[in-house]
Amino acid sequence: MSNRLQTVFLKTAEEKSGSHCISGCMYQVVPTIGTDGKKLLQLLPIPKSSGNLIPVVQSPVMSHGLKGNTEKPVQVTFQTQISSSSTSASVQLPVLQPANTTKYFLTGTIDTSGKDRVTSMGTGNFTPPISNTQNHGVKIHRLTRQTFTIPPSTQNDSSYFIVNTPSLPANVNSSTLPSGPPLTIPAHAEVKPVLASPLPPLVQQKILGTVTTSTSGTVEASQIPAVFYVSPVNSVKIIVDKKTQNIYHKPVTFSTSQIPPNVATKTQLNSGQHPQAAPVNLIFQEYLQPGIPCLVPVKSSNNVPSKVFNTFVDRKTLGDNTVGTPLLSTNSSSRTQSISVPIKDDGLIMFNGKVLLNKKGTYGLPSKIDQQNSVSSDIPLKDSSQVVSSSLVTEISREVLSSVLVKSKSFQLKTKSLSNSQPAPMAHIKPEKSEKVERPSFSVTSPHTTNQSTHCLKQSKIVFINPVFSDGFRTGQNTPRKENLIQNIRSSVDAATVTSQQCVFRDQEPQTQYEMASILKKDIQERSNKKYSQGNHTKASYLKNDAEFKKIFGLTKDLRVCLTRIPDHLSSTKSFDSFNNLKSSSYKDANVVMKEEKKQSFSKKRNAKPMKKMDYTKRRKIENASDMVMNVMNGTDVANSQLLSSILPISDIAQHNIITSHSTTREDKRTETEHCCHEKQEKGTLSSSTSFEQSNYFNKNYTEDIFPVTPPELEETIRDEKIRRLKQILREKEAALEELRKKMHQKQ
């Protein structure tokens, strides 16, 4: 079967030799290749006839579109006999413009490969004028000859008419058969595989015509095939202006009565087709019923739907409809419910190389339904299809556990496996109200009309079964295993804050709800026992917990604090007067803290390592602050000491506010700012000195640890050096700006 469009160019004797007489001229078919790469058949005139013409058997069908005007070209159709009922072709011919009114006799045949072979052609004079177009046809030895009349034309432009393979004149008018203008596949058309059960009843009758039905009148789920649905498709609307409207006649229907049923066809010629429009690809397809062909004209504006369409068009029609298409296998007789809604757009349905047109307004293809907040709600909708038994989806829905929705923002949901023997994939589920669950629905044609109802579940998004097809297409993700479908959702909140009112259970089966409640209750009890028995854990358990924490936070190295001693010349400066007064009390407090730390267990030391890393960074910043204090005391930068406020920690600033609360007198804004910054410098130096006094004890404590002492990283040192240089440059620039401000102030 082929859908290639073959164009035949007819060159008359006038074009070849300049003679005005073309009577008795025969044509020879020469296959060529056009400029666009398509195969063409060129007819060249020959001087003599190669044989006698077969007499014409009158079987006229009158067309009243010309109304006696002999200068109007007509759209005609010739019929060819095909050797196989599953193959046909369509040919596009230009309208001939001879000098005289001529009757052309064309006799053609088509072999199984789909290539046109014109066996004999001839011309004869016809007495003008004519008032009607006559059509004749006869079948002799699997050959059909079609006679049509073409009036002369004085127009210079080239007109075209399309010669289609006729189709059936029987009662085949339905929503699945194309009629009217051709179809266009837009660029945004979607090609997706769907099951045949949600499709309209007429389409199911075509697809599921040979599928065996049970005694109850329903089709088993194991017999439901998969089809490919292309949507949307648009009808081509051609606007005809006044100049060309009188050229084309009204639609003419040609029918034959002497053709056997396996090749009897019917074609409607569409009125208003513009001659300059792009030729329409006529793709021939056959329905499931043998001997009933149908033409589906398609003009694609997108390469992807066109390629997919042509791929299924080229497939040969199989005798058994279920062969070559994987079916959905089930093992039980449980029922599931579906909802079908009217289709909004036209669509093409492809199944085993066959094409059906699905008109909009018919019922089928389940849509997304707005879910309710209740546990389940019944929504009855009328549908022309009956529910089919699908045990697989029902079994999956029973095994999938509902997620726990917690309204508090502080709660965090995470998934864990139900047991060691049934692992489940880890997934973080967000408790959003807008998330819904889409469940597949299965239904088939039935003479009874029932009201459908479904249970609407508001859960997190879960993808259910998606069968994979042998053609390379699949409906979505792979089908998950049964063990992975069982998920245990456990929240990481405290056991004391979780109550049954904050958890909403939504599922179809009460047994599943009870199972989920028992799992959550067990988890709460475990957390409660763990909370009240923390003091009884051994060092081994603490070491295990430490290893887990380090793994969670990505800590791969041991944390160390490197301390250096403060220079001696700083102790003689005026900035350490307050430190000398508070040195004894601060040192006592530090000793108390160190003794308490020493009494702590081994696990407490290890848990405090992240905090010690923060102390290391804090102390390095304080060292930089002490360097700047030296520069300030030396007189290099007095006015720019405000920079220290951004370096000191927040806790030091808070303590500084407490220390300076005794100040009752206030100077102007500038003097107050300098005073505060000066005291902040003193506080920073105080913290640095306290750390330096404790350096010996810290070094001793860390050497007693089981981990070796490692120097600070090189990258940190380089980074700190760069920061120090940048701050130095900033201080110099600010000093220069301050000098400029002073000069400007003096000038004013």
From Swiss-Prot:
One of its GO terms (cellular component) is nuclear matrix. There is a cross-link at residues 436, 583, 680 (Glycyl lysine isopeptide (Lys-Gly) (interchain with G-Cter in SUMO2)). It is found in: Chromosome; Nucleus matrix. GO terms for biological process: dosage compensation by inactivation of X chromosome; regulation of DNA-templated transcription. Residues 715-748 form a coiled coil. Keywords: Chromosome, Coiled coil, Isopeptide bond, Nucleus, Phosphoprotein, Transcription, Transcription regulation, Ubl conjugation. It holds the Pfam family LRIF1. Residues 416-436 are annotated as: Disordered. The modification Phosphothreonine is found at residue 710. The modification Phosphoserine is found at residues 391, 419, 578. A motif (Nuclear localization signal) lies at residues 604-607, 618-621. Its main location: nucleus. A motif (PxVxL motif) lies at residues 559-563. It comes from the Eukaryota. One of its GO terms (molecular function) is nuclear retinoic acid receptor binding. Belongs to the LRIF1 family. Together with SMCHD1, involved in chromosome X inactivation in females by promoting the compaction of heterochromatin. Also able to repress the ligand-induced transcriptional activity of retinoic acid receptor alpha (RARA), possibly through direct recruitment of histone deacetylases. The Pro-Xaa-Val-Xaa-Leu (PxVxL) motif mediates interaction with HP1 (CBX1/HP1-beta, CBX3/HP1-gamma and CBX5/HP1-alpha). Interacts with RARA. Interacts with SMCHD1; leading to recruitment to inactivated chromosome X in females. Interacts (via PxVxL motif) with HP1 (CBX1/HP1-beta, CBX3/HP1-gamma and CBX5/HP1-alpha). This is Ligand-dependent nuclear receptor-interacting factor 1. It comes from Rattus norvegicus (Rat). The gene is Lrif1.
